[in-house]
């Protein structure tokens, strides 16, 4: 008897053993999907991790069916799953759920997309018979038009005797109806007469049009060519290379040359981007060069599209290049040779909720290690502290590109003291006279402007002017955000909505006012100040669909809109030729965040947003509004002094035991009842301190201590580099299991965020 150990798509640790019925033994190998029973009535699609002959010491159920003829999971992918599960302290089931498209975990068989085609009946496929067909419908004008349109589209009208002059072209029913401007009833009438018939064909959901045109790749500038050569030299010695290039230095063009080299060596490339918005712009550039050798993969694609990409990657003709966001790291690669991680510093590479809370950069580096000779290139204008430190220490190769493409100057950054301007009553709401003048001039010159505010919604909150009442979420420990366009107060944590009240429920006053400012409110105010502007807003609310992203970027690129207002989405490497002015409305909101990474993240955000200004022959202008113009980080942004920031922060990190010198693990506890959550967190903290001593901080309330009715407490563990990470995880799991055995804590949830951002 043979047995399989399988992974279930459930948040459960380890694998589960089932027997293989007689007749199926030869069909099952690791990496295949099988249908298995669980409990009395449930069935799941499980992933085979191992096949063996070791009989378990319990009665195990047989698998119901084998769903694959070939493995859906490659050995390298499974090893990546194991590493993510172990390092990020999540179950294999969680990794399975995150990695595979839901269509491959559904008990319903995946249905390929079918298209209905129209064809000429065999009895009419000669010149004489066609005349008969046309005479049959000459009195029915709509049918006559539909038939002649079909004959033209399909090229049956080019008959000479019994043979068409050109090859017959397939015509879909939808195409015929559109071109002939007719209804389905007209086509059906032609079918009923026996002139036409319909048939179905499987069609891919993926855009496979376009041949590769590697000859269209632009030659590199001298600075780019030098960086390219250095990267290749570094990759001979190091598996990971960091390309530190200023904004608009032409890093993407270097990537394209590296991709071409990999393809010529018959290797595959994984190109990761932090935001789906970025894939739209980069996709257009890559598609012109690599055509149908390029595949796109991210969460805004339909599940069916993601299944088709997965299956194509397992075929004998996979994509040579995959361009995608975080989840693309899980795709199968048969001959991976190069991984490019663009904007490697971006926090959106880190998965937050649900588990596994993995970092795509770390996962991609680990994935590359599983292929012989695969290399990783990290690219950014503002490296993460960890990556730059690794490069300085010699763990990674380092290549620097310090000049912008075509010697375009870095933007002029003008720091505006809004505290002083407010005191002198010179501000117009949140806008300084310098900012308004710069935007006005840009619009007058036919140029574009970007305004950055890292908060969506109309206003962060509303408040009663009389008693100070602020509406709070009933499920979470946060105030509700005002969204004026839909006239709702919304919780950005659980999605709870509440109609905007007309009077204060606490004191009855009607004097309710918005406090703070979000992108939606800025859009309204700027429309009043610049009625001639064509304004677009880019935030989470306006980009919920793939088409919304593409439309926003396309409209701004083509000049249909000329003033873009947005959150951090607009900072992430988007290139717009006509942007001459960028306004950072409130630098202080990024700097005042209670987090040890606040200055690092604020510098990155401001430097990246500033980098959107100035393209093609004109120096850009950035208006940076702040109440604290003398802060060192403001000066570092103005002078683009990343090295100064790095040196200053590094000393603090070493002194206070933070990355890159220490690894952090956040331990979270959740429970419906606050007292139980508090008590459990103190007990767990005491247990962990017994093992790790002063490395354990807390328990404490996080900034938001209640989400979706669950109370939250947090412990932080600081682990010096070189400590046995696996031993630490064993201790943590042991402490968790012991605590959950206590009947008082049966409903307690414990989870981990490893290397939190």
Language model region names:
Residues 686-711, 750:
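A carboxyl-terminal module marker
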Residues 38, 55-60, 64-67, 702, ...:
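Solvent-exposed, membrane-proximal periplasmic/extracellular interface segments of envelope transport
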Residues 215-221, 225, 237-678, 686, ...:
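Inter-lobe coupling/hinge segments of SF2-like helicase ATPases
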Residues 1-380, 394-408, 691, 725-757:
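Accessory, non-ATPase domains that flank or precede helicase/AAA+ motor cores in DNA-metabolism machines
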Residues 14-16, 172, 663-665, 711-713:
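Short amphipathic alpha-helical segments
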Residues 33-34, 80-83, 664-665, 669, ...:
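Hydrophobic/aromatic-rich, well-ordered segments within soluble, folded domains that form packed cores
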Residues 50-52, 100, 200-202, 453-455, ...:
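A general secondary-structure junction signal
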């Amino acid at each position: 008897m043979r047995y399989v150990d399988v992974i279930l798509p459930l948040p459960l640790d380890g694998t589960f053993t089932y027997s293989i019925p007689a007749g199926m033994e030869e069909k099952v190998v690791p990496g295949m999907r099988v249908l298995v029973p669980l409990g009395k009535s449930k069935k799941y699609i499980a992933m085979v991790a191992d096949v063996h002959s070791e009989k378990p010491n319990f009665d195990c159920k047989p698998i119901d069916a084998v769903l694959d003829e070939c493995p859906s999971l490659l050995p390298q992918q499974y090893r990546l799953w194991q590493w993510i599960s172990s390092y990020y302290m999540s179950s294999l089931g969680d990794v399975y759920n995150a990695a595979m498209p839901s269509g491959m975990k559904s008990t319903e068989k995946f249905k390929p997309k079918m298209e209905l085609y129209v064809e000429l009946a065999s009895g009419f496929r000669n010149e004489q018979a066609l005349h008969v067909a046309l005479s049959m419908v000459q009195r029915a004008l709509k049918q006559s038009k539909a038939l002649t349109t079909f004959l033209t589209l399909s090229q049956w009208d080019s008959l000479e005797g019994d043979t068409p002059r050109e090859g017959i072209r397939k015509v879909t029913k939808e195409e015929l109806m559109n071109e002939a401007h007719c209804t389905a009833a007209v086509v059906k009438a032609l079918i009923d007469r026996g002139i036409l018939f319909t048939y179905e064909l499987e069609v891919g959901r993926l855009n496979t049009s376009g041949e590769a045109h590697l000859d269209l790749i632009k030659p590199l500038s001298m600075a780019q060519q030098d960086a390219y050569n250095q990267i290749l030299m570094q990759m001979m010695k190091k598996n990971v290379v960091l390309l530190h290039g200023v904004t608009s230095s032409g890093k993407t063009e270097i990537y394209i040359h590296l991709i071409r080299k990999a393809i010529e060596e018959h290797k595959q490339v994984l190109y990761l981007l932090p935001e789906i918005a970025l894939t739209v712009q980069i996709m257009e550039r890559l598609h012109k060069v690599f055509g149908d050798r390029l595949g796109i993969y991210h969460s805004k694609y339909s599940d069916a599209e993601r299944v088709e990409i997965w299956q194509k990657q397992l075929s004998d003709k996979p994509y040579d290049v995959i361009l995608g966001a975080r989840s693309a790291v899980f795709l199968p690669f048969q001959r991976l040779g190069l991984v490019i991680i663009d904007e490697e510093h971006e926090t959106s590479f880190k998965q937050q909720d649900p588990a596994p809370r993995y970092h795509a950069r770390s996962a991609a580096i680990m994935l590359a290690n599983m292929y012989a000779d695969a290399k990783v290139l990290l690219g950014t204008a503002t490296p993460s502290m960890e990556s730059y430190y690794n490069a300085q220490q010699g763990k990674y190769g380092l290549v620097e590109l310090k000049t912008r493409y075509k010697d375009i100057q870095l933007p002029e950054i003008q720091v505006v003291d809004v505290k002083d301007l407010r005191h002198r009553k010179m501000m117009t709401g949140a806008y300084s006279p310098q900012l308004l003048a710069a935007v006005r001039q840009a619009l007058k010159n036919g140029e574009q402007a970007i305004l950055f505010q890292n908060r969506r919604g109309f206003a962060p909150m509303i408040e009663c002017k009389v008693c100070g009442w602020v509406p709070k979420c009933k499920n979470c420990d946060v105030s509700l955000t005002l969204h004026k366009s839909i006239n709702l107060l919304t919780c950005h944590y659980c999605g709870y909505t509440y109609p905007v009240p007309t009077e204060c429920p606490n004191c009855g006053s009607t004097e309710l006012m918005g406090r703070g400012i979000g992108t939606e409110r800025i859009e309204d105010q700027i429309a009043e100040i610049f009625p001639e502007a064509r304004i677009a807003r880019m935030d989470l609310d306006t980009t919920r669909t793939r088409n919304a992203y593409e439309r926003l970027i396309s409209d701004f690129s083509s000049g249909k809109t000329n003033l873009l207002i947005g959150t951090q989405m607009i900072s992430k490497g988007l290139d717009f030729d006509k942007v001459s002015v960028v306004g950072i409305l409130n630098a202080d909101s990024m700097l005042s965040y209670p987090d040890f990474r606040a200055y690092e993240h604020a510098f990155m955000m401001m430097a990246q947003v500033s980098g959107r200004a100035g393209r093609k022959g004109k120096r850009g202008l950035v208006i940076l509004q702040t109440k604290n113009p003398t802060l060192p980080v403001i000066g570092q942004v103005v002078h683009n002094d990343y090295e100064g920031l790095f040196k200053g922060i590094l000393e603090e990190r070493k002194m206070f035991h933070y990355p890159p010198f220490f690894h952090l693990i956040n331990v979270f506890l959740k429970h419906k009842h606050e007292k139980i959550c508090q008590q459990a967190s103190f007990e767990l903290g005491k247990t962990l301190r017994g093992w790790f001593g002063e490395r354990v901080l807390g328990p404490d309330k996080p900034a938001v201590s209640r989400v979706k009715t669950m109370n939250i407490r947090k412990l932080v563990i600081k682990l010096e580099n070189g400590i046995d990470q696996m031993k630490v995880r064993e201790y943590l799991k042991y402490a968790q299991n012991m605590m959950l055995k206590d009947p008082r804590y049966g409903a307690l949830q414990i989870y981990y965020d490893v290397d939190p951002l």
